[in-house]
């Protein structure tokens, strides 16, 4: 992963021994693993001090569970800590999904990439949570953003959070002790048989000098997998569910490898972590991690939080460019099967035949649907898919001796991830103008393709466009780029309007990514996990992402874009089932219904809300942009006020001010029945009437939205009634949703960034 990310920027990677390296002052950063891959627990205090003396920042790739026993990276001087949260309560799932983490010091918090949830205050002065520092993110800063991240694995992070809530610091300490003491017991036994360990100090992993082939044969006979880094070494890890019987079996295997009979071993009961590296500071000290210790308590805590969210279980979520469709129960069921949950991503191929059949069939299905020759499931999000696709194009040009091609054309209407991903791939971004109807300005594109023909890498294009229309000249656009020597990357964010009717291959693109969490029915999970596979034409097949451990990808594949060879493999049965259950005709029908639903809503709302862009036929694709640009002048109400007021009607806000300022982007998907769309339409029409009635009044029902139950029940000084605030239409009473907080002060939250201990 480091090699993949660093190479486009020309960053030199130096792999060396931490205790032998001397900093020169040319370095900008260093990364160490804690514990190391071979299990070694090392004291990096002197290394970090030497780095800081030369102005170098240090990152620790740290195992979270180990930190229940080991001194925290911050204590020995690290500036940043990163890693996986998977082992805190989420299954391996043949590689994922799992949430990563990144932590840093106070001084660097405003340079953090990705989503940050911070504390602010609402209109009534109550503490409220919100996404903080959005100005640094890709949807605003585009190629100047701190990352291309759009998806955050919020669902997996929540699962890890609940695991920590339930177990608390004492539970994590108990789990860490179990893993460590099992490793220590095996270490003593192996050393007694004259095996040599790679590291004297360890947490839960041992690397042993042994004849790998002999040990592997014996281990497989006993149903155990080890990892074999070389022909002369064996590596094993233990965890909180390792049993005494399994410890004894491991010892017997190594005894048999030496032709011996295992002797009884006394279990180790005291920590072997060096005193200088033992943790002495508190963790998980907040009340929430020390309160819920029964399943009933935890269930009620989770339910309390769930009731504060508007989800698809409440009403339609009209977020444009997000495709919030039904996640059918039948598709979700396989996720609970142990065979999918418990498979290790590096398990021998003959132990993963079911997974491999599923992966192969799904790759073939997605390639067929997109009109391409091959597919990689490795990217873990749409943004990661964009990056992977661009890196494949880059590798293709390099293979032809044209590595100097580094210009990417991107329409002004494109989602911010496009230029952010291009920047991460080391590309120079040239923006292509759009015309008054929201289409790509073809003449401007042709002019820029010609101007940069000697260095053109490609074009990033979305179809239908981010403006929600099918561009009639899309093939002409593709041909112009090809004629200039470039490749065409198609953003698959809007594939829900293509499947079964057309495809990127037919249009002429060379590569596309898909959002399985949009078009192909995986849950969004409050932001993730996502899966963003790429599909490519035949001439790009050889460059699909490879992996350093498991054979996958093309013969000349780019280096890995994710830690797991097939990305978040445990989620793949969802999309596999979606495709198999619908079949070709069903997939086409879903696309048709998505387009019909969007056009129905656009037409129904037309008397009150103009659709900002439409195609040559006067129709939209699968989503529409509602024009609210005059509301501020006419009513002193902006699109954010209307989005907030929709919450009082029981609806999640649409996409706000994207891709056009002061607009709402609405995408109903094929999943919504007419009755639900009609309720949403009625709500928007009713809000328009409220805006008209409120014109010129600062204290009005729209500007003050949303209204909480506490506010409704408290002292009332507004010129409108409580009933008008809480129950604006009769059907709202049937299943009223009260937001937990009212309108949040975004500026306050950014000026006073606080993410923890913010009481």
Regions found by a protein language model. Give the residues of each.
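Short strand-loop junctions, especially beta-strand C-caps/beta-turns
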Residues: 34-35, 239, 380, 435, ...
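Non-catalytic terminal extensions of PLP-dependent enzymes
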Residues: 124, 132, 136-150, 157-374, ...
């Amino acid at each position: 992963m480091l090699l993949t990310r660093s190479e486009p920027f020309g960053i030199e990677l130096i792999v060396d021994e931490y205790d032998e390296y001397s900093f020169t002052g040319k370095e900008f950063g260093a990364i160490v693993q804690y514990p190391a891959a071979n299990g070694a627990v090392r004291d990096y205090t002197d290394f970090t001090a030497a780095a800081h003396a030369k102005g170098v920042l240090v990152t620790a790739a740290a195992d979270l569970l180990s930190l229940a026993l080991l001194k925290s990276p911050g204590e020995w001087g690290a500036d940043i800590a990163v890693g996986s949260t998977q082992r805190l309560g989420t299954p391996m799932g043949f590689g994922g999904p799992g949430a990563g983490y990144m932590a840093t010091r106070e001084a660097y918090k405003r340079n953090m990439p990705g989503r940050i949830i911070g504390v602010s205050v609402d209109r009534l002065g109550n503490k409220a949570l919100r996404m903080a520092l959005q100005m640094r993110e890709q949807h605003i800063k585009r190629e100047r953003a701190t990352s291309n991240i759009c998806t955050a694995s919020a669902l997996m992070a929540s699962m890890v959070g609940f695991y920590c809530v339930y177990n608390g610091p004492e539970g994590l300490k108990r789990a860490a002790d179990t893993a460590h003491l099992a490793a220590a017991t095996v270490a003593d036994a192996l050393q007694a048989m004259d095996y040599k360990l790679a590291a004297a100090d360890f947490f839960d992993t041992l690397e042993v000098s042994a004849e790998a082939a002999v040990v592997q044969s014996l281990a497989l006979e006993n149903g155990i997998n080890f990892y074999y880094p070389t022909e002369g070494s064996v590596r094993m890890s233990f965890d909180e569910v390792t049993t005494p019987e399994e410890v004894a079996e491991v010892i017997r295997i190594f005894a048999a490898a030496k032709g011996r009979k295992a002797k009884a071993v006394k279990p180790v009961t005291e920590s072997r972590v060096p005193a200088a590296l033992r943790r002495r500071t508190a963790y998980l000290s907040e009340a929430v991690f020390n309160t819920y210790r029964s399943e009933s308590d935890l269930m009620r805590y989770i339910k309390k939080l769930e009731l504060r969210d508007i989800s698809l279980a409440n009403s339609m979520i009209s977020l444009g460019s997000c495709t919030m469709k039904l996640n059918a129960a039948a598709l979700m069921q396989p996720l609970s099967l142990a065979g999918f949950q418990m498979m290790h991503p590096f398990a021998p191929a003959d132990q993963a035949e079911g997974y491999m059949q599923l992966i192969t069939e799904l790759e073939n299905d997605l390639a067929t649907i997109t009109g391409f020759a091959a597919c990689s499931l490795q990217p873990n999000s749409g943004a990661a898919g964009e990056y992977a696709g661009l890196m494949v194009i880059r590798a293709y040009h390099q293979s032809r001796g044209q590595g100097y091609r580094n210009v990417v054309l991107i329409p002004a209407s494109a989602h911010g991830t496009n230029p952010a991903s291009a920047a991460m791939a080391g590309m120079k971004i040239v923006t292509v103008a759009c015309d008054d109807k929201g289409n790509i300005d073809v003449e401007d594109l042709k002019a820029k393709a010609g101007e940069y023909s000697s260095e053109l890498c490609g074009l990033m294009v979305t179809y239908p466009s981010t403006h929600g229309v099918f561009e009639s000249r899309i093939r002409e656009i593709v041909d112009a780029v090809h004629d200039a020597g470039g490749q065409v990357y198609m953003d698959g964010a809007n594939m829900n309007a293509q499947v079964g009717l057309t495809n990127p291959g037919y249009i002429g693109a060379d590569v596309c990514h898909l959002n399985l969490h949009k078009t192909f029915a995986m849950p969004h999970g409050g932001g993730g996990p996502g899966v963003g596979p790429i599909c490519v034409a035949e001439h790009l097949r050889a460059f699909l992402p490879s992996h350093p451990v498991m054979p996958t990808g093309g013969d000349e594949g780019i280096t890995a874009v994710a830690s797991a060879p097939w990305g978040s493999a445990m989620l793949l049965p969802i999309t596999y089932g979606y495709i198999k259950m619908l079949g070709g005709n069903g997939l086409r029908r879903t696309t048709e219904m998505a387009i019909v639903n969007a056009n129905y809503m656009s037409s129904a709302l037309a008397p009150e809300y103009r659709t900002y862009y439409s195609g040559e036929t006067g129709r939209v694709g699968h989503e529409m942009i509602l024009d609210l640009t005059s509301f501020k002048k006419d009513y002193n109400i902006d699109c954010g006020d209307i989005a907030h007021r929709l919450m009082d009607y029981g609806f999640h806000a649409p996409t706000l001010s994207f891709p056009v300022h002061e607009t709402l982007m609405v995408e109903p998907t094929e999943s919504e029945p007419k009755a639900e769309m009609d309720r949403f339409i009625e709500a928007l029409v009713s809000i328009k009437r409220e805006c008209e009635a409120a014109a010129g009044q600062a204290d009005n029902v729209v500007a003050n939205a949303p209204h909480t139950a506490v506010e409704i029940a408290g002292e009332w000084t507004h010129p409108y009634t409580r009933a008008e605030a809480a129950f604006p239409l009769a059907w709202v009473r049937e299943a009223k949703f009260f937001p937990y907080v009212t309108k949040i002060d975004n500026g306050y939250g950014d000026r006073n960034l606080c993410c923890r201990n913010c009481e």
